[in-house]
């Protein structure tokens, strides 16, 4: 009987310890607004999105929203999978 309690204790302990180190992969989307009325090009949006992203954010798509904005979309890895205005759709990995 003591062995089964010990086994149960070890299983619960390992689950608690492993859950503390979960990493989340989150999709993010943000728009870049232009200061002047420019006609955004594919290259301009790509450059603007790369400048906007931090080191831990991978860009997988950029597109035009309208004549004054580009959309930047990508994936980032974070410790906490809480959605925000920019971060959406987090999955534990």
From Swiss-Prot:
The keyword Disulfide bond applies. Expressed by the venom gland. This is U-scoloptoxin(15)-Cw1a. The lineage of its organism: Eukaryota, Metazoa, Ecdysozoa, Arthropoda, Myriapoda. Contains 3 disulfide bonds. Residues 1-22 form the signal peptide. One of its GO terms (cellular component) is extracellular region. It comes from the Eukaryota. Keywords: Disulfide bond, Secreted, Signal, Toxin. GO terms for molecular function: toxin activity. It is found in: Secreted. Belongs to the scoloptoxin-15 family.
């Amino acid at each position: 009987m003591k062995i089964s309690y010990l086994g149960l204790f070890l299983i619960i302990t390992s689950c608690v310890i492993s859950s503390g180190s979960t990493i989340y992969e989150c999709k993010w989307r943000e728009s870049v607004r232009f200061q002047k009325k420019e006609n955004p090009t594919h290259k301009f949006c790509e450059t603007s999105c790369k400048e906007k992203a931090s080191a831990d954010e991978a860009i997988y798509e950029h597109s035009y929203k309208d004549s004054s904005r580009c959309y930047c979309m990508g994936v980032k890895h974070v410790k906490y999978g809480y959605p925000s205005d920019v971060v959406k759709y987090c999955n534990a990995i």
